[in-house]
Amino acid sequence: METKSKIISFIGLAKKAAKLSIGKDAAYESILENTAELILFSSDLSTRSMNDVEKVASKKNVKTLTTNISMSDYEQVLNKKAGIICIKDSGFAKKIQTLCEIQE
């Protein structure tokens, strides 16, 4: 299985485990509630949205990553179009982060 597919699979598992926040507002809320472990940005997310979330995440020491996965790819697994995904579980966050680093 290629790395991109593995990342998408882990995102799907995190969704089933209710360990995701999907979208900008949900990510903000998770960051401010200190439940965010990792923020993922889609490859086609606007720079403005990315910068807005990165500012808040950096203040709370939450890691952010831009993936090479598009919003439409995320939509297939989440059934919702989203460019910002917040992982709220440290195990899922570590595995996805490792896979993203391998992919680079």
Name what the model sees in each region.
Residues 1-4, 102:
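N-terminal targeting/trafficking signals and adjacent low-complexity tails
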Residues 5-38:
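N-terminal first-folded block
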Residues 14-15, 58-59, 77-80:
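Short glycine-enriched loop/turn motifs at secondary-structure junctions
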Residues 25-30, 48-74, 100:
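Positively charged, polar, low-complexity stretches
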Residues 37-38, 63-65, 82-85:
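Structural motif
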Residues 43, 68, 89:
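Short secondary-structure boundary segments
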Residues 71-104:
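C-terminal structural segments of small proteins and small subunits
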